[in-house]
Amino acid sequence: MYGNYPHFIKFPAGFGNSPVHASSTSVSPSSSLSVGSTVDGHHNYLEAPTNASRALPSPMNTIGSPVNALGSPYRVIASSIGSHPVALSSSAPGMNFVTHSPQPNVLNNVSSSEDIKPLPGLPGIGNMNYPSTSPGSLAKHICAICGDRSSGKHYGVYSCEGCKGFFKRTIRKDLIYTCRDNKDCLIDKRQRNRCQYCRYQKCLAMGMKREAVQEERQGSRERSENEAESTSGGSEDMPVERILEAELAVEPKTEAYSDVNTESSTNDPVTNICHAADKQLFTLVEWAKRIPHFSDLTLEDQVILLRAGWNELLIASFSHRSVSVQDGILLATGLHVHRSSAHSAGVGSIFDRVLTELVSKMKDMQMDKSELGCLRAIVLFNPDAKGLSSPSEVESLREKVYATLEAYTKQKYPEQPGRFAKLLLRLPALRSIGLKCLEHLFFFKLIGDTPIDTFLMEMLETPLQVT
């Protein structure tokens, strides 16, 4: 009955490897979309680039949402600074796109400046003229690496915060990159995340000094021995304040809660839950881009991480939102779904697990927003997601979140030495529940009895491949 549709679904780990036909509008592999910037807190809007071979034959052409960036048919995730759109296709393994992103490779060691040779196509390397260094003209400096606005002189070169952080992480972690093209990739403000190999070589070619990073690290280590622990806690590269800001920025304003039996909703709790999930997918990309260093990853890796963890990220959010309600969950739409309604709809088992293993535990320990944000960031930075070009970098970011969360709990709750461990124990339950919820969603989609909205449907139709 599904033979006329081109896409296949392969279930995530735990569901077997049998492909299941799914209904889907055929999408041209060459179609692409770009995500506009967020204005006044509203969601990003999509617009077709001029070089797209044809318009995407989908209602999403007229509906703006950053979620359309989540893979085929979600074409691109563009960072808030306007990263260049990347065309995706269904031919690449795991993530269904074709890219030229770098991957770590021991054959291309660029860990020392002696290995660097002049790159073709690097403009003005030998005759770069910097503006004056007076305080009044500092804002006029541009980044020598990508042309973005410079924040000052870093490691010997005027550069932006993005290139400064990229160079520092590369040196401190001794990262090794490769170029999938001819080692002459254009590095500018829009495409600086496309090739880490060429970006790093340009940093060195423009005069950034490895030893400056190493000296800075040694100096910070010595200072830390003489300074008291920061009141905010955690890593300076992963401040808990930024994680909290991300949570607060996307939290729906549910001032007036309503019941599932009101006229504004259907009587089917599954339909209400699916509608709420679809609505929250609008804000998921916006949230992720506010998490420190997520936008520094390649666009391909951003897509992979969001598609690998979207269900767990949404479940964690509505579970924490539900600690204030009795025997039910509170959806982003403001609807309160009762336990009895879930049982009558045939999803009582998984609903009870959400209440007992997540909502109840969060309520008992009074988990705050900062802790929730850290747990969600840990879920986001999943180094085991299939197809990542730089899993070691993702793992390093996850470890930074671990350190931030541990420092935060020690500083905020010194009388609870086991709080950090209790928080981490919610992650296996969240993972298990997330997989079971996916199983239910696939079932409801296939039997066709439950209306599933556009964006959630497309997320279900292009899951990660299991290898």
Swiss-Prot record:
Signal peptide: none
Membrane spanning residue stretches: none
Molecular function in Gene Ontology: cis-regulatory region sequence-specific DNA binding; nuclear receptor activity; nuclear steroid receptor activity; retinoic acid-responsive element binding; zinc ion binding
Keyword Membrane included in the entry's annotation: no
Top-rank taxon: Eukaryota
Keywords, comma-separated and alphabetical: DNA-binding, Metal-binding, Nucleus, Receptor, Transcription, Transcription regulation, Zinc, Zinc-finger
Domain NR LBD: 235-463
Any one biological process term the GO annotation gives: cell differentiation
Disordered: region residues: 214-237
Tissue expression remark: Isoform 1 is highly expressed inliver. Isoform 2 is abundantly expressed in eye and dorsal root ganglia.
InterPro entries (UniProt xref): NHR-like_dom_sf, Nuc_recep-AF1, Nucl_hrmn_rcpt_lig-bd, Nuclear_hormone_rcpt_NR2, Nuclear_hrmn_rcpt, Retinoid-X_rcpt/HNF4, Znf_hrmn_rcpt, Znf_NHR/GATA
Region of interest (Hinge), ranges: 209-232
Function: Receptor for retinoic acid. Retinoic acid receptors bind as heterodimers to their target response elements in response to their ligands, all-trans or 9-cis retinoic acid, and regulate gene expression in various biological processes. The RAR/RXR heterodimers bind to the retinoic acid response elements (RARE) composed of tandem 5'-AGGTCA-3' sites known as DR1-DR5. The high affinity ligand for RXRs is 9-cis retinoic acid.
Similarity field: Belongs to the nuclear hormone receptor family. NR2 subfamily.
Oligomeric and partner information: Homodimer. Heterodimer; with a RAR molecule. Binds DNA preferentially as a RAR/RXR heterodimer.
Domain notes: Composed of three domains: a modulating N-terminal domain, a DNA-binding domain and a C-terminal ligand-binding domain.
Name this protein carries in UniProt: Retinoic acid receptor RXR-gamma
Annotated organism of origin: Gallus gallus (Chicken)
Lineage start: Eukaryota, Metazoa, Chordata, Craniata, Vertebrata
